[in-house]
Amino acid sequence: PPAAAANLGPDAQARFINLKAWRAEVAREHNLPAYVIFHDATLAAIAERNPASLDDLQGISGMGAKKLEAYGAEVLRVCQQG
């Protein structure tokens, strides 16, 4: 796994992989590099926290208000699908 995800437990690893797949899709749709959506470290932090609400996403490094608004609901959906 990437360094960002090296310390994650098995459930968080699975969420991280799902989040990376989702990010790749979004990046393709918007014709952006993946890191512009979220860095690996941000995805790893999200995977570790396993957010259940938008409030849970606040305060994660790399998750600003704009990204929370743009991607928050999708990120929660991806985390819940595992």
Residue ranges and their predicted role:
Residues 1-82:
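Accessory DNA-binding and partner-docking regions appended to nucleic-acid-acting proteins
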